[in-house]
């Protein structure tokens, strides 16, 4: 940096002066020709200064309505009225970014012209940044430039937009795109305005203050760090808000806090003024004030207006600092200081901040999206992105923004990291410096805080965990913290054991160490309101809490021990976990404390650290079994001695701690983290290279320091270790040795690293082989690590699960895991490792990823390493020379809901192929095999029973007796792995009930459900299972059935992604319909209508459902109405969905509606809401409604878990307070577009205008941001909106007891209304053919039109040829469509513009569909064939799953035979026999059709009968067939239907029962299909093609059958 850096504008250094005009004490700076004056309560001063220095005929004050309400206008009027001759005009604006527009600018200019204002006018911009930018631009352009002054009223405007002369308005394409540089004459910074700000707005401005200090002035930054409480107190504290109106107006009345605040504002303005003076037009140096803005603006572009500018810049500063760390080596300590400083002012420092995570829009923030937005940045040079890079606090790498490649930005921003194989890259010996020890750092912080005096901590770990600890200790006022040596040294001013309760909750994130230690420290707290002798008698409360995972981690033994010693601690939610309320009683009693130490040594350390401040000496006895992690206890004792307290070990597990105080050393060196050191050392081991870690040797306090000697050396590594250094050289790649067995109880945190090495340790170790308890010479069993189940995640299960993704088998045991090594060449590529938000999982798996062949291994949740080694990825990709790159660039930058914190079990993904195998799991006797066999038949798949596969290989009882249950489960897992690999498509696989008892099997199922196909939990009522097993001969469990069921139930949920209820015979049918969602084509976005079911049980609707659902595409199941309190049980809902699936094939819209949204579920019942709604996803419902009013993290999770379910994101304004034209409605729409596949907004109509406003809204968003939208108004006045709504309109039916919402209409009523409004013009439909006099087609279609309220007419047009009359009808403007029958099915094609592939291959068209271009009005005629579809439908309805690969017989070779042959081919028949009375015609037709149809002509039906066909289709007149010779031309053999079940179809229209159907009636396993059924089925297809609506089938059938039979009776 040149001499420019660090300086401020010269006037910054001038002393303040008392204004001769107003008496106010003023600080003045200069920015170019602009005077910047700072002070308190300056309105009178402003008026007098302007009158004196800028005389004018008129002064125009432009402000917003919010400031007007706060009295701003009155203050200025009073000030100007006190000056004779001053003319003040006022213009008020609506607040908010929406005002910063062309329209508002024009309105101001029109107003100014109307008031005859001239060029001498002075404009006063009083407000925030919006006012300043807008009014400045008005001043820049009105009459080619007016004088104006800035009077910023927000901190952000004071230090940012008001200084520098930038003015602008927004454009739909972006912010500030139209503007000018126009310098104000004055900037009046009146800090008194800040008293009117909410705290969030104050913090918003502090982001810019911190920014200027970070890039320019280290001294200012230190001031912001150390004086945050005073700075905030100047305007945020209660005392400040109660000050007199003149407080601070003069230096004599100014408090120290006010002076400090003004000083930091002045410092920030001084920096910007200095930079602007040098570089007014932003050619280089002025870029620096954009630190944090390159990334911050991209974040803001997505999250505005919900997240403020300063909040986005705060996150941007941290991310850009991380980029500087990666590109130019910015020390982590600088980033840690920046993060802590931002947090001091309540600013977000990560996108995972709760305020950001609460927004659904955050899922739009992807790496690709941010990079795309960053492309448009004024700092950029063409395609090169420019970012301001810090070199340290107070300085930048260059005096301008620096060029940074996209790849570097991606590595920092991306939510995942791709780690590529690196064994081929040679490396010289490396020295890697690891961060300070987390364990030592956290203990040192507590010890220094509890000590009296000052202690300097060096090499402290700068990470999330230590930040949490420091924040907690500061919040409890146990210590004050400051930085020295440019942040390399933390200065701790301890309070000697004095701890005060905090009014705010102490948030401990997922920092387990901090949670345990701070719980003990909180027991020393006194109430902050107590003083003197009363302190012991008054009590505050310390509220300790954390994130979702922290609330699952145990703390019960510590709480029990502290309670036994007088502490008053209450659990707030569940027992044994945070949150806790600790009553501030001042001290522990002392004496004997018994503590269970078999779960975590941190409990012991927590008591030890605080014990000296008990009222008496403490004797700590460790009870309850083997003590876990004794080295960490020894570390605590050794560190306590360094701080002046000697702990006496009076027995093996009994310690005596004296009542005393800590005496801090002046300096304490934190040694490097031994657990973190295992990763670079392991990389040396696995890649055959050399790595040295200094500051870690035999003299370390940490147990993990022995990792190199006790793990790596026996595995074949060369290890050199002295007291202060460790060097490891690995063997040749692939030559690591397995250890057989190893106890890692003394270094539990290192077991994951060891497991990675054991995964590829294929060489057995002779020294350990004899003592191995493993079954494999190349496996290693790790013991002594049971406590790792309750760390950041269940690490044992996580390692087993994630290793399986790489093809490595591992098995869980009670006290550890066994890892079976795999050759490096056999590791699976393309794995995606989920890290469970656990830093050690991420770093350890990145070690193993170094040797995985292929394109790379993806490490998800890469930011979790920030807990202990924030720069790990920089080190891995830098000094360690491992090829890495950002991954998942199109995924959200933050995972809003990690799987380890999900509210419920998994759901299906979008990755399944349509033929993906289906895996069934569930309790013994749940019906897996029965349902599976039936399902396999329905879906034409192969059924596999895993238990049968096992029993074919082994005698199960003998196997268990000889090898034990562990070996049985291991072999079961091996067989499962084989089945899932070899039978991944085209199968239904039923598994044994206990398969989920094995962690390895659960990992295999998890991988299968995530990537291959659905795993379905078959649920059956427990009483039925119990009853069945009580009378079965299956072997007993050896424990109560209820206990087995209770243990397995959560494991079934965890292992499956769907669940289905075995309700009886139709369970397979219901499941087949359920599986259409994950395995079929996604349902359409825009069906026309859905019917809302309002019954307490779906069974109650069965009698009317077919009638009530006429014309609807979807059924809505109102789950909240299934119980009187709106909260039905999961079991009840599961059963109701299954029953509905059995009864209807219509798609389901699954809705849980809250009270405030017009339903029955209580609004506060969030847990019930999310559990019930998630069930809809697991039940495979095609559409699921999610309410936008529910907590964002929960609905975001549902949206992410949707699979192929369509999400309807809904909002219902039941109170009528939301206006369609209000910005809030647009924001709801935008949010719904982000979360859902369909947006649903429901308003409340009181007048006709409300519906007109809705239509304006619909039109506007369709033009600006088109998205599938349901937009309707409730009540009768809103029925217009229901009439014109284009998709998924909710409807009722007269047969329903009540409408689901006020104003609902029926399908029939809506169509009538649409016709009257001209939205549904009348169309004419025809039947072309001859003879057609007796055709039922007009009755079919006209009945449908009438039932659904359609205005159309269907008529016969009989003609012998396709003549001019036919052409005239099909070309008419009101032509709606036509049916075509003999003899025109071929000749009609000459009039058509297109013919479907089906109709082409059949060679016949029976349906004409007009396609209209709504823009040009042009109509194209399209030909279809629905005959074959009707045959397929009716065979599928009755075949019971037999037709796949079956034999089919088609009788007759006439015109309709081709459709029948095509239908048989589409059904999958492996052999199609074709018989015709004239054999030659059958031969000719067989030769004409494609050879892949496999059509074989036969000359005898007797021969056909021997082939045992499963499907028979007759295409000859009924009178042409009989059972006896001479009766007709074709004799049907009596054994023609000799196969075991099938479907016989007679295409003949009359009589109703033909000889073939008579034959079917004589065979109970055969189903006969009448010609009238085929006519109806093909007509139903035609109706949907013409209208887009489902026909009212049942009502049509009733009408048509009656007419058909009446006509037959009259013949």
From Swiss-Prot:
HAMAP family for the chain: EPSP_synth, Pentafunct_AroM, Shikimate_kinase
Region labeled Shikimate dehydrogenase — which residues? 1322-1611
Binding-site positions, 7-phospho-2-dehydro-3-deoxy-D-arabino-heptonate: 144, 160, 166, 176, 208-211, 272, 286-290, 293, 309, 378
**Protein's job:** The AROM polypeptide catalyzes 5 consecutive enzymatic reactions in prechorismate polyaromatic amino acid biosynthesis.
Q: Which organism is it from?
A: Malassezia globosa (strain ATCC MYA-4612 / CBS 7966)
Residues holding NAD(+): 64-66, 97-100, 128-130, 133, 153-154, 175, 193-196, 204
Protein residues bound to ATP:
922-929
The answer to whether UniProt assigns keyword Zinc to this entry is yes
Can you say what this protein is called? Pentafunctional AROM polypeptide
Cellular localization per UniProt? Cytoplasm
Task: Give GO BP annotations, semicolon-separated.
Answer: amino acid biosynthetic process; aromatic amino acid family biosynthetic process; chorismate biosynthetic process
Give the main location: cytoplasm
> Mind listing the GO molecular function terms for this protein?
3-dehydroquinate dehydratase activity; 3-dehydroquinate synthase activity; 3-phosphoshikimate 1-carboxyvinyltransferase activity; ATP binding; metal ion binding; shikimate 3-dehydrogenase (NADP+) activity; shikimate kinase activity
Keyword entries, A-Z: Amino-acid biosynthesis, Aromatic amino acid biosynthesis, ATP-binding, Cytoplasm, Kinase, Lyase, Metal-binding, Multifunctional enzyme, NADP, Nucleotide-binding, Oxidoreductase, Transferase, Zinc
Q: Which residues form the signal peptide?
A: none
Q: What is the similarity comment for this entry? A: In the N-terminal section; belongs to the sugar phosphate cyclases superfamily. Dehydroquinate synthase family.
In this chain, Zn(2+) is annotated as bound at 208, 293, 309
Region named Shikimate kinase:
915-1092
Whether Membrane counts among this entry's keywords is no
Question: GO cellular component terms?
Answer: cytoplasm
UniProt cofactor note? Binds 2 Zn(2+) ions per subunit.
Ranges for the region named 3-dehydroquinase are: 1093-1309
């Amino acid at each position: 940096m040149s001499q420019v850096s660090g300086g401020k504008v010269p006037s910054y250094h001038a002393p303040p002066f008392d204004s001769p005009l107003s008496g106010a004490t003023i600080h003045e700076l200069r920015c170019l020709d602009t005077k910047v004056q700072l002070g308190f309560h300056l309105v009178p001063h402003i008026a007098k200064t302007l009158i004196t220095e800028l005389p004018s005929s008129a002064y125009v004050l432009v402000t917003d309505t919010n400031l007007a309400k706060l009295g701003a206008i009155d203050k200025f009027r009073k000030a100007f009225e006190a000056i004779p001759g001053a003319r003040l005009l006022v213009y008020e604006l609506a607040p908010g970014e929406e005002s910063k527009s062309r329209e508002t600018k024009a309105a101001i200019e029109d107003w100014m012209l109307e008031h005859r204002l001239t060029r001498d006018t002075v404009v006063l911009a009083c407000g925030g940044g919006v006012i300043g930018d807008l009014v400045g631009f008005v001043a820049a352009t009105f009459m080619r430039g007016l004088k104006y002054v800035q009077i910023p009223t927000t901190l952000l405007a004071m230090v940012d937009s008001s200084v520098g002369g930038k003015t602008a308005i927004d454009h739909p394409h972006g912010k500030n795109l139209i503007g000018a540089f126009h310098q104000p004459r004055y900037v009046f910074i009146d800090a008194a305005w800040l008293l009117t700000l909410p705290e969030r707005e104050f913090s918003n401005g502090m982001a810019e203050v911190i920014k200027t200090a970070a890039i320019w002035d280290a001294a200012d930054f230190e001031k912001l760090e150390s004086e945050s409480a005073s700075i905030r107190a100047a305007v945020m504290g209660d005392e400040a808000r109660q000050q007199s109106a003149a407080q601070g107006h003069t230096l004599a009345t100014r408090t120290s806090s006010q002076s400090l605040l003004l000083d930091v504002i002045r410092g920030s303005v001084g920096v910007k003024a200095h930079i602007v003076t040098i570089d007014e037009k932003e050619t280089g140096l002025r870029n620096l004030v954009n630190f944090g803005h390159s990334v911050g603006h991209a974040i803001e572009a997505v999250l505005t207006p919900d997240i403020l500018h300063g909040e986005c810049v705060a996150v941007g500063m941290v991310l850009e600092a991380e980029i500087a760390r990666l590109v130019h080596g910015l020390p982590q300590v600088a980033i840690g200081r920046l993060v802590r400083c931002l947090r001091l002012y309540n600013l977000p420092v990560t996108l995972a901040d709760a305020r950001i995570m609460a927004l659904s829009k955050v899922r739009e923030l992807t790496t690709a999206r941010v990079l795309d937005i960053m492309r448009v940045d004024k700092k950029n040079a063409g395609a090169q992105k420019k970012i301001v890079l810090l070199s340290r606090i107070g300085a930048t790498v260059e005096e301008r923004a620096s060029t940074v490649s996209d790849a570097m930005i991606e590595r920092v921003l991306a939510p995942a990291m791709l780690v590529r194989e690196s064994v081929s890259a040679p490396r010289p010996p490396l020295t890697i410096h690891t961060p300070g020890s987390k364990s030592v750092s956290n203990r040192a912080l507590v010890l220094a805080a509890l000590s009296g005096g000052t202690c300097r901590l060096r090499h402290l770990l700068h990470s999330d965990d230590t930040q949490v600890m420091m924040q907690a200790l500061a919040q409890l006022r146990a210590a004050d913290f400051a930085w020295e040596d440019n942040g390399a040294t933390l200065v701790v001013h301890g309070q000697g054991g004095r701890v005060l309760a905090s009014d705010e909750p102490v948030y401990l994130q997922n920092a387990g160490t901090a949670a345990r230690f701070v719980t003990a420290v909180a027991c020393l707290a006194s109430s902050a309101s107590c003083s003197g002798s009363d302190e012991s008698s008054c009590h505050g409360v310390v509220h300790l809490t954390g994130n979702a995972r922290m609330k699952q981690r145990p703390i019960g033994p510590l709480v029990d021990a502290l309670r036994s010693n007088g502490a008053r601690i209450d659990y707030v939610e569940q027992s044994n976990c945070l949150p806790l309320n600790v009553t501030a009683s001042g001290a522990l009693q002392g004496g004997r404390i018994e503590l269970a130490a078999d779960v975590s040594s941190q409990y012991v350390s927590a008591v030890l650290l605080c014990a000296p401040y008990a009222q008496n000496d403490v004797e700590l006895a460790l009870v309850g079994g083997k003590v876990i992690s004794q080295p960490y206890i020894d570390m605590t004792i050794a560190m306590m001695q360094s701080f002046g307290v000697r702990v006496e070990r009076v027995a093996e597990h009994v310690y005596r701690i004296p009542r005393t105080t800590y005496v801090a050393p002046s300096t304490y060196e934190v040694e490097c983290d031994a657990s973190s050191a295992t990763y670079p050392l392991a990389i040396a081991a696995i890649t055959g290279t050399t790595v040295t870690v200094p500051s870690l040797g035999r003299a370390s306090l940490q147990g993990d320091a022995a990792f190199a000697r006790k793990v790596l050396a026996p595995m074949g590594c060369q290890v050199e270790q002295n007291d202060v250094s460790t060097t490891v050289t690995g063997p040749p790649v692939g030559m690591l040795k397995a250890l057989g067995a190893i106890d890692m109880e003394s270094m539990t945190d290192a077991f994951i690293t060891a497991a990675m090495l054991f995964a590829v340790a294929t060489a057995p170790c002779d020294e350990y082989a004899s003592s191995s308890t493993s079954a494999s010479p190349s496996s290693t069993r790790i013991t002594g690590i049971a406590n790792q189940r309750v760390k950041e995640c269940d690490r044992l299960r996580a390692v087993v699960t994630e290793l399986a993704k790489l093809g490595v088998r591992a098995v869980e045991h009670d006290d550890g895991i066994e890892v079976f090594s795999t050759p490096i060449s056999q590791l699976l590529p393309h794995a995606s490792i989920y890290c469970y938000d656990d830093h050690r999982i991420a770093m350890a798996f990145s070690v193993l990823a170094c040797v995985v062949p292929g394109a790379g291994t993806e490490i998800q949740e890469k930011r979790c390493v920030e807990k202990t080694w924030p720069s790990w990825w920089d080190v891995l990709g830098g000094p360690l020379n491992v090829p890495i790159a950002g991954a998942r660039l199109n995924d959200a930058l933050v995972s809003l809901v990690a799987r380890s914190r999900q509210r419920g079990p998994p759901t299906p993904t979008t990755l399944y192929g349509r033929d993906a195998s289906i895996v069934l799991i569930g309790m013994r006797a749940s019906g897996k095999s029965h349902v599976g066999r039936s399902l396999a038949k329905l879906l034409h798949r192969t059924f596999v029973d895993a238990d049968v596969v096992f029993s074919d290989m082994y005698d199960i009882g003998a196997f268990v007796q000889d090898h034990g249950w562990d070996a049985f489960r291991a072999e079961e897992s091996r067989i499962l792995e084989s089945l899932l690999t070899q039978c991944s498509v085209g199968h239904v696989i039923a598994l044994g009930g206990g398969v989920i008892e094995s962690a390895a099997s659960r990992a295999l199922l998890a991988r299968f459900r995530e990537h291959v196909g659905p795993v379905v939990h078959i649920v059956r009522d427990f009483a039925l299972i119990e009853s069945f097993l009580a009378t079965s001969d299956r072997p007993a469990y050896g424990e109560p059935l209820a206990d087995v069921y209770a243990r397995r139930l959560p494991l079934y949920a965890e292992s499956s992604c769907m669940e289905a209820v075995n309700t009886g015979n139709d369970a397979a049918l219901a499941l087949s319909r359920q599986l259409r969602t994950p395995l079929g084509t996604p349902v359409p976005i825009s069906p026309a209508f859905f019917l809302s079911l309002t019954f307490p049980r779906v069974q109650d609707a069965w009698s009317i459902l077919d009638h009530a659902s006429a014309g609807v595409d979807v059924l809505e199941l109102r789950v909240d109405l299934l119980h009187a309190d709106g909260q039905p049980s999961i079991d009840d809902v599961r059963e109701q969905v299954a029953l509905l699936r059995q009864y209807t094939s219509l798609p389901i819209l699954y809705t849980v509606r809250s009270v405030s949204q017009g339903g029955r579920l209580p609004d506060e019942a969030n847990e019930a809401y999310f559990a019930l709604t998630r069930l809809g996803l697991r039940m495979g419902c095609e559409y699921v409604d999610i309410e936008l009013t529910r907590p964002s993290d929960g609905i975001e999770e549902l949206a992410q878990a949707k699979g192929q379910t369509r999400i309807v994101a809904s909002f219902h304004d039941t109170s009528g307070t939301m206006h369609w034209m209000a910005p809030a409605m647009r924001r709801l729409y935008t949010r719904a577009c982000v979360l859902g596949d369909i947006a649903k907004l429901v308003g409340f109509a009181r007048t006709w205008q409300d519906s007109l406003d809705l239509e304006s809204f619909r039109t506007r968003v369709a033009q600006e941001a088109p998205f599938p939208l349901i937009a309707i108004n409730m009540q009768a006045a809103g029925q217009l909106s229901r009439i014109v709504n284009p998709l998924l309109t909710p409807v009722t039916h007269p047969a329903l007891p009540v409408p689901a919402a006020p104003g609902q209409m029926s399908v029939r009523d809506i169509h009538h209304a649409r016709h009257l409004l001209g939205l549904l013009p009348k169309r004419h439909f025809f039947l072309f053919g001859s003879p057609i006099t007796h055709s039922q087609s007009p009755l079919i279609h006209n009945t449908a039109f009438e039932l659904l309220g359609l205005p159309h007419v269907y008529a016969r047009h009989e003609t012998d040829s396709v003549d001019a009359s036919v052409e005239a009808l099909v070309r008419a403007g009101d032509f709606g469509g036509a049916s075509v029958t003999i003899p025109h099915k071929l000749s009609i094609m000459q009039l058509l513009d297109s013919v479907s592939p089906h109709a082409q291959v059949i060679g016949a068209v029976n349906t004409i569909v007009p396609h209209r271009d709504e823009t040009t009005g042009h109509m194209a005629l399209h030909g279809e064939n629905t005959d074959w579809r009707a045959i397929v439908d009716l065979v599928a309805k009755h075949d019971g799953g037999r037709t796949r690969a079956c034999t089919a017989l088609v009788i007759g070779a006439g015109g309709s035979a081709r459709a029948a042959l095509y239908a048989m081919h589409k059904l999958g028949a492996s052999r199609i026999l074709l018989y015709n009375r004239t054999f030659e015609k059958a031969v000719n037709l067989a030769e004409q059709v494609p050879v892949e149809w496999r059509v074989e002509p036969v000359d005898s039906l007797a021969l056909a009968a021997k082939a045992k066909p499963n499907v028979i289709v007759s295409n000859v007149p009924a009178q042409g067939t009989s059972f006896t010779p001479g009766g007709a031309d074709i004799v049907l053999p009596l054994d023609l239907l000799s196969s075991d079940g099938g479907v016989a179809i007679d295409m003949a229209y009359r009589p109703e029962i033909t000889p073939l159907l008579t034959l079917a009636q004589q065979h109970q396993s055969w189903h006969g299909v009448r010609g009238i059924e085929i006519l109806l089925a093909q007509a139903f297809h035609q109706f949907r093609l013409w209208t887009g609506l489902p026909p009212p089938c049942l009502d049509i059938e009733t009408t048509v059958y009656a007419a058909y039979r009446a006509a037959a009776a009259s013949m």
